[in-house]
Amino acid sequence: MENGYGQRSQGFSLGRIIGDPFALATISIGILAWIIAFVSSIISAIHGGFPNFAWWTLVFMFFCIAGVTITVASDAERTYHVAIVGFLSAGLVFTTSSVNSLVYSPVAPFEAAAAGYILLSMITIVWVFYYGSQPQASHRTFVDSYALHKEGPGSRSSRPISNGYTNRPETQNASIPPQMYTSAQLNGFETSSPVSGYPGGPAGANGRNSSAPQFGGMGNSQTPTHDEQQQEASIEYPYRAKAIYSYEANPDDANEISFQKHDILEVSDVSGRWWQAKKPNGETGIAPSNYLILL
């Protein structure tokens, strides 16, 4: 589980529901199922013999559906997904128990109420499977790809990676020039592969020369040295990863690379939170692992 998801808009907007086919379909079916169960329960109670337990199920599921609707419209699903799964799991017990109390009755209103509770149970199972899975899960990635507010660079605020990842040692102080980072500097969360365009070795090694680009300079116009080209060519990329979100590189960090959602990248090492990757056009650099999924 990620510890932080970055800042996201907390405003309530029905457009997030309308723009998300999965949320729109499941919430609509859930509301319809609740109405069927509610109306049928009233008619069943008039006939007599309706189990009182089923009324509590209706009240509980009303707040569950309302809670899911509010979290989706507020773009707070990843913040409250654990609570959502917990309440829905309890609701599933209530709805299935109500079905068991009603489905065997020959009275038509009882059967209609049972049908409503069955629909509520089915929607609850779907929600538990969706919200109980990580955002990187294949089925969630597929479902979220159709949501308008979760697509493209504009949805950066809804991605499951904390903005704190960019606060690595090399970017905390703008006066420090870019360099090849050692495992001690990175505390073990970077890959040990050398970054493209930078000579290897610890900070201050003799292999470093003035051809390395500097912040704010015109380093992009300089030609890499022969040693750097050999070093870059020696890196192997045995893994392939697919981008599940678009990522815009930090302009203050020349090591990072930008990529678009669904891009296929070659990866040299998958042991840290930042992976050494190569784009199809040959550009190399580091990419956040939470934006990628191995193929």
UniProtKB/Swiss-Prot annotation:
Subcellular location: Cell membrane
Ranges in the topological domain labelled Cytoplasmic: 1-22, 74-81, 133-295
Composition bias, Polar residues: 155-176
Keyword flag Hydrolase: no
InterPro entries per record: SH3-like_dom_sf, SH3_domain, Sho1_SH3
Region annotation (Disordered) ranges: 150-176, 191-233
UniProt function note: Plasma membrane osmosensor that activates the high osmolarity glycerol (HOG) MAPK signaling pathway in response to high osmolarity.
Protein name (database record): High osmolarity signaling protein sho1
Species this protein is from: Pyrenophora tritici-repentis (strain Pt-1C-BFP)
Gene behind the chain: sho1
